[in-house]
Amino acid sequence: MKFIVKPHPEIFVKSESVRKRFTKILESNIRIIVKARTQGVAVFNRRDHIEVTSNSDTYYAEVLEILTTTPGIQQVLEVQQSSFTDLHNIYEQVLELNRANLENKTFVVRAKRRGKHDFTSIELERYVGGGLNQAIASAKVKLINPDVTVQVEVVDELLNQVIARHKGLGGFPLGTQEDVLSLISGGFDSGVSSYLHIKRGSKVHYCFFNLGGPAHEIGVKQTAYYLWQKYGSSAKVRFIAIDFAPVVAEILEKIDDGQMGVVLKRMFMRTAGMVAEKFGIQALVTGEALGQVSSQTLTNLRHIDNVTDTLILRPLINWDKEDIIRLAREIGTEDFAKTMPEFCGVISKSPTVKAVKEKLEEEEAKFDFALLDQVVYNARQIDIRDIGKESLEKAPEVELVNSAEEGNAVVLDIRSPDEEDESPLEIVGVEVKHLPFYKLATQFGDLDQSKTYLLYCSRGVMSRLQALYLQEQGFNNVKVYRP
């Protein structure tokens, strides 16, 4: 197994020193994730590309997923490796692989060579190119701007040929930009805005203002954990949960109805700014889009920004909602967002779309700002890698079982449809049902509640989180299946 990783082109327009630093960080990021999720896979930095190789194809699918979801990669070339006897044997193998693709096309052969051979790279290109030109009557050699470039690499006694090209995420390697703190709610907007900053190379830490109790926090943790695991697991990031119920209660009691929405957002930004300063984070990220709700007019956004010196980034400011949802679908956060309740919109019945500074300050004079210090002091922060462990510690009643032999038990495979199709779960003598995790909130109650359900996922994190969530909803017939 061999992959050639092409870094994003923006990296190569940097100065030589910056380019080297970025590619070194990209190499390190790939190595960290590969080491955590595979065995026997090596990563090499080759100046203008990175090679990922193994003597086995065991982790082919896992490595390909890693490379196509790691920021900073433009393209992943899949390479077929084979042995060869001589120059003519190389030509025969190249012809076999490329014949169909070269019909009625112009082409050029580009070769690279490492090791001791009785031919040069130029001789290899000419021999293979001439042979292809003779063997495929409709093909024609064209050295400049051909339809197809046939890439051939010879390393010692191995022939490497590109057999597939996979699109990468683009962007910059994670950690090449400064850290940001994302105000995550679990909805469409905050998930997409977090992803965009991961893609651009920032380590994204998560700040969650809890307005909806334990079930809401569990749902948001699932979203944050998914984003980290899928796109940013080379980085150590924090998840900070703040119980904002006391602040909301104070607003409901003391603030004029029309000002509540803007005041709440100002309290969010004040508090998040305090958290960012505590951890040395340079900017806040929100999912706000211009005009999407009443608090997101230019006037209101300006008043919201003015309460903190911390930079506020809004990557979705000019996005249409359907574009946000489409990207959420592409990156895998849509299903989380669809089942996430919205709490912010209920606190103001007649929100102002054009707040006045003096009126806001008059209303906020009634507010006990000591509450903000209190909620920051009481905030809980965890390493995002420990979300699975925390869910287990906080819910010891969620039983883990490694056998599905209970007579009344059904194994409930909660993986996504793609995962289930790729690796179906089959257990002899045991009923297995498939219900994706994102449908549990709405469809678990429709199942036969006289049975016990053993929740299964690949790594055991999502199943524990979902079991905890279901128990919060009053379902006590759930366990976690870890064979």
UniProtKB/Swiss-Prot annotation:
<dbReference type="InterPro" id="IPR036873">
    <property type="entry name" value="Rhodanese-like_dom_sf"/>
</dbReference>
<feature type="domain" description="Rhodanese">
    <location>
        <begin position="405"/>
        <end position="483"/>
    </location>
</feature>
<keyword id="KW-0808">Transferase</keyword>
<dbReference type="GO" id="GO:0052837">
    <property type="term" value="P:thiazole biosynthetic process"/>
</dbReference>
<dbReference type="GO" id="GO:0009228">
    <property type="term" value="P:thiamine biosynthetic process"/>
</dbReference>
<keyword id="KW-0820">tRNA-binding</keyword>
<keyword id="KW-0676">Redox-active center</keyword>
<keyword id="KW-0067">ATP-binding</keyword>
<dbReference type="InterPro" id="IPR020536">
    <property type="entry name" value="ThiI_AANH"/>
</dbReference>
<feature type="binding site">
    <location>
        <position position="287"/>
    </location>
    <ligand>
        <name>ATP</name>
    </ligand>
</feature>
<keyword id="KW-0784">Thiamine biosynthesis</keyword>
<dbReference type="Pfam" id="PF00581">
    <property type="entry name" value="Rhodanese"/>
</dbReference>
<protein>
    <recommendedName>
        <fullName>tRNA sulfurtransferase</fullName>
        <ecNumber>2.8.1.4</ecNumber>
    </recommendedName>
</protein>
<dbReference type="InterPro" id="IPR049962">
    <property type="entry name" value="THUMP_ThiI"/>
</dbReference>
<keyword id="KW-0963">Cytoplasm</keyword>
<feature type="binding site">
    <location>
        <position position="296"/>
    </location>
    <ligand>
        <name>ATP</name>
    </ligand>
</feature>
<dbReference type="GO" id="GO:0005524">
    <property type="term" value="F:ATP binding"/>
</dbReference>
<dbReference type="InterPro" id="IPR026340">
    <property type="entry name" value="THII_Thiazole_biosynth_dom"/>
</dbReference>
<keyword id="KW-1015">Disulfide bond</keyword>
<dbReference type="GO" id="GO:0140741">
    <property type="term" value="F:tRNA-uracil-4 sulfurtransferase activity"/>
</dbReference>
<feature type="disulfide bond" description="Redox-active">
    <location>
        <begin position="344"/>
        <end position="457"/>
    </location>
</feature>
<feature type="binding site">
    <location>
        <position position="265"/>
    </location>
    <ligand>
        <name>ATP</name>
    </ligand>
</feature>
<dbReference type="GO" id="GO:0004810">
    <property type="term" value="F:CCA tRNA nucleotidyltransferase activity"/>
</dbReference>
<dbReference type="GO" id="GO:0002937">
    <property type="term" value="P:tRNA 4-thiouridine biosynthesis"/>
</dbReference>
<comment type="function">
    <text>Catalyzes the ATP-dependent transfer of a sulfur to tRNA to produce 4-thiouridine in position 8 of tRNAs, which functions as a near-UV photosensor. Also catalyzes the transfer of sulfur to the sulfur carrier protein ThiS, forming ThiS-thiocarboxylate. This is a step in the synthesis of thiazole, in the thiamine biosynthesis pathway. The sulfur is donated as persulfide by IscS.</text>
</comment>
<dbReference type="Pfam" id="PF02926">
    <property type="entry name" value="THUMP"/>
</dbReference>
<feature type="binding site">
    <location>
        <begin position="183"/>
        <end position="184"/>
    </location>
    <ligand>
        <name>ATP</name>
    </ligand>
</feature>
<dbReference type="GO" id="GO:0000049">
    <property type="term" value="F:tRNA binding"/>
</dbReference>
<feature type="domain" description="THUMP">
    <location>
        <begin position="61"/>
        <end position="165"/>
    </location>
</feature>
<keyword id="KW-0547">Nucleotide-binding</keyword>
<dbReference type="InterPro" id="IPR049961">
    <property type="entry name" value="ThiI_N"/>
</dbReference>
<dbReference type="Pfam" id="PF22025">
    <property type="entry name" value="ThiI_fer"/>
</dbReference>
<dbReference type="GO" id="GO:0005829">
    <property type="term" value="C:cytosol"/>
</dbReference>
<keyword id="KW-0694">RNA-binding</keyword>
<comment type="pathway">
    <text>Cofactor biosynthesis; thiamine diphosphate biosynthesis.</text>
</comment>
<dbReference type="InterPro" id="IPR001763">
    <property type="entry name" value="Rhodanese-like_dom"/>
</dbReference>
<dbReference type="Pfam" id="PF02568">
    <property type="entry name" value="ThiI"/>
</dbReference>
<dbReference type="InterPro" id="IPR054173">
    <property type="entry name" value="ThiI_fer"/>
</dbReference>
<dbReference type="InterPro" id="IPR003720">
    <property type="entry name" value="tRNA_STrfase"/>
</dbReference>
<dbReference type="GO" id="GO:0009229">
    <property type="term" value="P:thiamine diphosphate biosynthetic process"/>
</dbReference>
<dbReference type="InterPro" id="IPR050102">
    <property type="entry name" value="tRNA_sulfurtransferase_ThiI"/>
</dbReference>
<comment type="similarity">
    <text>Belongs to the ThiI family.</text>
</comment>
